[in-house]
Amino acid sequence: MRKVLTLVLVAAAATADETIPGVRLTRDDNQHQHTFADLWHDAGEQQDWVVQTRRELHRTPELLFDEKQTAAKITQVLTALQVNFTTGWAKNTKRAELAAKGFVSGEGGTGIVAQIGSGKEPCVLLRADIDGLPIHENVDSPWKSTEDGKMHACGHDGHAAMLLGAAAVLKRREAEIKGTIRLIWQPAEEGGAGGKRMVEEGVLSMEPKPQAAFGFHQWPFLPLGSIGGRPGPMLAATELFDIVVSGVGGHAAMFAIQRVT
C-alpha cells in the first residue's frame, strides 16, 4: 500500500545515518542496504491486511474520547507484532465543556504510543487519528458502519490502519534502525483536541525526544501514489463561535427604524 510506504520512507529517512539513493537503515555499508523497491515490496505485502483492517475499523466507528473498541483493535495488532506500546493517553478533562458545545464525548484514555527501534536518537514521530464522526452512513457496502449515527466519514479508519501497516514493516526491520520511531494513535481529533491533550500529558517529552513529527491525511484529489506538502499550515480546522447581535428588529421593508447597537 503506497501510503504505508510513505510512512515507512519518512521514518527510515529520518533515522538513517545519511541520505543516499534508495533508503538506508543501517550504518553497515555491506549489509541491510535496502532500496526503494525493497520497501515497496514489504509495504505491498501488507496491502490486503491493511485494507481488511481498515474495513473492520470502518464497521465500528466511535466518537471522540470514546474509541475503546478501536484502541483495543490497535493494541491487539501491536501485541501480535511484538511492538512495545503504552495506553491510557488523552484523558478527557473537558467533558462538560465539550458537552456545552454540543459534543458527546467519552472519558478518554484511548490514545496509544508505540515505539520501534534502538531506543536512541534520532527519534521521529508518526501520528494517526482514530475517531469517527456523528454522521449516519447511507452508503451500502459490506463494511458499512454498524453504529447508527456514527461513521468514519473523514478517513481516520484508513489512517489508523495504515500506521499499523507501517508498524508491521518497520518492526520487521527493527534491527536495522539506528534511531527510534515513535508511533501515535491519537483520539478525539474531531473537535476534542486529543493531540493537544497528549502533548499536555508529555508525549513530546518522552526520551528520546522526537526531532521531527509527521502526520498525513488521505486526499482523494491527488493521484494514487503521490504525496503533497508545504511549509507551514496545510489544512484548515473547524472552530465554534457565537455572534450576539443586539438592537431593534423589524420588518425587512422598514429597515430605517431598525438599528444595531
Could you describe each region identified by the protein language model?
Residues 20-152, 161-178:
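Acidic/His- and Gly-rich active-site-bordering loop/insert found
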Residues 3-4, 55, 157-160, 218:
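Hydrophobic alpha-helical segments, especially transmembrane helices
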Residues 2-15:
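Cleavable N-terminal signal peptides of Sec/SRP-targeted secreted and luminal proteins
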Residues 102, 110-112, 133-134, 140-151, ...:
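Histidine/acidic-residue-rich, glycine-tolerant segments that coordinate divalent metal ions
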Residues 12, 165-166, 257:
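Residue-level detector of alpha-helical segments with a strong bias toward transmembrane helices
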Residues 14-15, 141, 168, 229:
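Hydrophobic alpha-helical membrane context
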